[in-house]
Amino acid sequence: MTRLENMYKKEVVPALIKRFGYSNPMAVPRLVKITLNMGVGEAATNKKVLENAVADMAKVSGQKPIVTKSRISVASFKIRNGWPIGCKTTLRRSKMYEFLDRLINISLPCVRDFRGIPPRSFDGRGNFNMGVKEQVVFPEIDFDAVDAIRGMDIAITTTANSDAEAKALLDAFNFPFRN
């Protein structure tokens, strides 16, 4: 069991029961999954770029990502239906908690001019979305071996019914929200 899983069971659940008055510990919001997505627009012209993006995401997530393909042809983007244009992976259970621990304690403090994450990134249903502008903030990525700086989207899915519950859950994990 990872550090954040222990923290969730021993500290977060009792704190959220006390704050929101849940009658059952199973009613307390929990993390379901973390989805990482990296869109690589230049993959339409250069296949090597997508291979490097997949390798970077595999290092960051600890599992092999799937290659996403375009659903429709768009002439202005110069892509056709079925062409590979990005990669994504879904983290669950212990890998999810390990990634969140590294994100909170190692990667986000490495971001230049980091003053916290704005709390307006909730979707109204208890899920949180954020973006990272460069993949080199993760310690698994070697800065010298990177061919291009790429960002990625991080979607944290919870069982919370409201944004307030989800924010309280992430606050309990010491998520660095902006004041």
Curated annotation (Swiss-Prot):
Pfam families assigned to the protein according to its UniProt record, in alphabetical order: Ribosomal_L5, Ribosomal_L5_C
Molecular-function GO terms, alphabetical: rRNA binding; structural constituent of ribosome; tRNA binding
SUPFAM superfamilies: RL5-like
Domain of life: Bacteria
InterPro entries tied to this protein: Ribosomal_uL5, Ribosomal_uL5_bac-type, Ribosomal_uL5_C, Ribosomal_uL5_CS, Ribosomal_uL5_dom_sf, Ribosomal_uL5_N
Gene Ontology biological process: translation
Keywords, sorted A to Z: Ribonucleoprotein, Ribosomal protein, RNA-binding, rRNA-binding, tRNA-binding
Gene Ontology terms: cellular component: ribonucleoprotein complex; ribosome
Primary role: This is one of the proteins that bind and probably mediate the attachment of the 5S RNA into the large ribosomal subunit, where it forms part of the central protuberance. In the 70S ribosome it contacts protein S13 of the 30S subunit (bridge B1b), connecting the 2 subunits; this bridge is implicated in subunit movement. Contacts the P site tRNA; the 5S rRNA and some of its associated proteins might help stabilize positioning of ribosome-bound tRNAs.
Family statement: Belongs to the universal ribosomal protein uL5 family.
Subunit note: Part of the 50S ribosomal subunit; part of the 5S rRNA/L5/L18/L25 subcomplex. Contacts the 5S rRNA and the P site tRNA. Forms a bridge to the 30S subunit in the 70S ribosome.
Protein name stated in the entry: Large ribosomal subunit protein uL5
